[in-house]
């Protein structure tokens, strides 16, 4: 401590331990003050739309990011995203902020789980540094030999063993063999090894005149086996210093004369050992491992055919073999059906006996080797295989029926050269622990973790890999801990769900070992079964324990209970939210008065989602048989109609594959609606005539335009425009309903084109979004704003919340508008403005706007609605409102199928389909189906275990 400086007070250290936010006013936040303890796990909770994300992301993260960007030079700032300063008085004690959101982080088709977690980068280095190249011919390791290697090989024999040091005859283009041997004679070399016999060069020239007159380097050059070898020295094995020195000189001479090759022949066995200073073996020249060799983003490593994508346009296996439960004999090869093309199948079956090919085995049970025979052929089968069939079609393309058949089976398929590995063939020759990099990236992460945990390396390799292995194993353990053990490193990033992407980013953050940072996470429990939540909490605590502050926007009860500090935003949503209802450790919630906070009421049990008194009966259903897409194991599933069906299971068990990739797409195909091809299944049967339409309701934004809003989506604004156009002033001025549209020329402000704001780009500062000077943010021309209904113009109406608008239009008996708006209120969105831009809505709000649209349509035709995790972003209280809306759909004669982890939804289902028992390869089976009570009674699987607690609560 320096003299003259006061000792730090307790108050100072207390403040240093906290992040202080004063007067936050972003979006609906009402000038709130928040204190967040540093190095803690903090959960921000509250109703959907209450202002949680406004505090966590739009205030804390935005300011942390802005401060980081501001610290850079003006030159660097022009290349970075420009950040707004959030509306608040001040934020003190804010560490560098990192946001991990629910967005799929990469749309790049080259990005994989391995590259995004950086594990693949470490694997590349590992294989480049300690990988051993194995010859595919002999299975021996390929090495660049040194004289020491040759000496060690010789000394491996017992003392006194006779051997010769040999070199291949150096081939000089344009010279005859005789001329080359004459040069050796001049150099003092006098003998050759001819098939193990030692002969003098003069004798060989006399005995083989024809061979000696052959010109080297010409096409008529004899095979390498017929060439004699040049004898450099004759020795016997001895560990004597002089003998070893002589051997070393001879070996160096052999390498020089043999152009990098040397041979040892031992007697009396005449065994021949080959050594080379070149990286070659078995007549193949190999490339030495470098990290670029294993990079599919580098031209040095990427497969030349698919250029590192792993997929090419070719013959699609799924189109050729649509039903893998059939055998070759039963007609699994679709293009070999019919009278004419069936001859190919018959001929293949006849010839298959030559190699014992199992023609009665289902296609999905065939080994990779057996599939290669079927697709690429075998010498014993002649030219009968699938590839040869399509080559025949290509040769005869002048026939229109062949061109049509080729087009029918063409699609994106796995690259035949690299078999989906994305790498050149040389990469597969390099092994670590007996496995190639391709083998490792195709293993599930849980298996890969075990592989590295038990990896045995030589002392030298272990020393080289000492810094690489901990980086790889720690990241693999983190991925397993966040419930992603079923993924492979080769899985493309753009096929991951939002929840999976977020947890991969979380594992990457843990692996990076950053400390002293602020991590802000948006519902990391999304897509996570209750079984995995405890492991997620452990990971969040690890992130905290290394010295970070972790702020989590979350609704999951287990995570709320595990928090060090809770901030409850509310009390309601929208304009009725934006306040701190209570903040403190979990134990403090008992002091909050009942009815003040929905969160506290649910935690204490005062408010809860009740289990239905009875389950709906059903007698109509749609059945899928033999579903084998992705990891599904040929399961038979029945989806009841006219009830609420919930599909449950741990992460990676196959829920999305079953419902979205197979069931939904199969229904689309049944209705002849264009869409992606469904995953593999044998048949779909049942009461398909009982439904007339199908709708898949996801969380994607309701509109891409900034002018898109809830009122336009549910068609309520159409009624409002008609109402405004019917007013007397509109009639006098000749206004039509289109005049009141901000998406069309006519009535909208020509300056801002109906946006109400003008964006001004600033080179080194954040873009300025200024109120339009022409319309003052009201979107329309003045003459349009002069038209009023009951004292309100179109801008005033768009500024109303849904609740206010319903009250206003009900008062003035405009029931057509109320009818369109009511469903938005019913799904719990009464707090949002009519004209609120869809860009500002959360994923959960977008999904509920879509639900409201379907509720407002009142379709007479029975429709099948499929929801993908509709509880995302929803508080306990919001889930209750959502369930009422879903039940309203069912009461109108529709059917509802939900992919969901939330047990409050599962306990309210009429029918549960539980997949599992684990994720990835260990999933894809039907664990249980039936009512929640029947699933619990069966007692199998994780869902039954956790659901039992909910039903008994």
Language-model features and meaning:
Residues 2-953:
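Conserved phosphate-binding elements of NTP-dependent enzyme cores
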